[in-house]
């Protein structure tokens, strides 16, 4: 993610519990380095948790100074109610299992013997899916996390029929 954002011209601030890895990343991508504890207070557009789960919790959410949480880490919310906490603070939450669906899509494409082009087409649809989830959340006045769960549940019959 850091490489993609760097190549797109984003200004980056990085942190990791592995201080050496964080320093290498900061050096390689001309990013500002902060500690894993400081990252929550950093004023930024996007907070992208990409490693540890359950990092969005009662202690960290009040410290966030961002507009969007969108990262690839699994199970970012410590509890379902934390989606409400993010919403109450005006922070848009991109549900992790929608954003990081590329891995499972890749596995499915492999099992179905799909081409690289077919795989890339599926992966680019993640963006559209995310927009659908945000729209569902807005229309139904629910959190994006709940909307993502409803969306996934609505897709299960289709997925099961592919077997």
Please give the residue ranges for each predicted region.
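Short, structured coil segments at secondary-structure junctions
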Residues: 8, 29, 64-65, 89
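Glycine-rich phosphate/diphosphate-binding loop of Rossmann-like nucleotide-binding domains
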Residues: 1-46
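Short low-complexity, flexible loop/linker segments enriched in glycine and/or proline
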Residues: 22, 27-31, 50, 85-86, ...
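Adenosine-phosphate binding glycine-rich loop
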Residues: 67-163
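Residues within well-ordered alpha-helices
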Residues: 1, 21-22, 57, 82, ...
